[in-house]
Amino acid sequence: MQDAITSVINSADVQGKYLDGSAMDKLKAYFTTGALRVRAASTISANAAAIVKEAVAKSLLYSDVTRPGGNMYTTRRYAACIRDLDYYLRYATYAMLAGDPSILDERVLNGLKETYNSLGVPVGSTVQAIQAMKEVTAGLVGADAGREMGVYFDYICSGLS
């Protein structure tokens, strides 16, 4: 896992250079939004279960996947879906705090699409639920923090598509 600081420094180090104006601007932006990211993470942490519950209600609860024969039918499959959404929310929050999506590749996306396809998990429904979670989260944390979190939700959706 990297963060925005490590990413900027590693890039300069690989090139054997000091940090240039562009690198300094990236660091400045990261530090400027630090308090916003910490407040958003605190709000998300305190409301994680409610965020997931509302996202499921908005996107999956009354769709074909929850009816008999659907991929979320049976309590066990439904619970696994809820667990996965909570997992995506948690790791998107970590990535937002770090200002870098690398943790999403390392801990969430590597091999996930293939696993879902082999298990018959409907990726489209999963992406729909993540987009609903993005909307619910933005409503809770505000527009600026919601846009920042949205970057990482979109990153997960892109990795699954």
Swiss-Prot record:
Contains one covalently linked phycocyanobilin chromophore. The chromophore is added by the phycocyanobilin lyase CpcUS. (2R,3E)-phycocyanobilin binds at residue 81. The modification N4-methylasparagine is found at residue 71. Pfam families: Phycobilisome. Its main location: membrane. GO terms for cellular component: phycobilisome; plasma membrane-derived thylakoid membrane. CDD domains: APC_beta (cd12126). Keywords: Antenna complex, Bile pigment, Chromophore, Electron transport, Membrane, Methylation, Photosynthesis, Phycobilisome, Thylakoid, Transport. One of its GO terms (biological process) is photosynthesis. It is found in: Cellular thylakoid membrane. InterPro entries: Allophycocyanin_b, Globin-like_sf, Phycobilisome_asu/bsu, Phycobilisome_asu/bsu_sf. PANTHER family: ALLOPHYCOCYANIN BETA CHAIN, PHYCOBILISOME 32.1 KDA LINKER POLYPEPTIDE, PHYCOCYANIN-ASSOCIATED, ROD 2-RELATED. Belongs to the phycobiliprotein family. Heterodimer of an alpha and a beta chain. This is Allophycocyanin beta subunit.
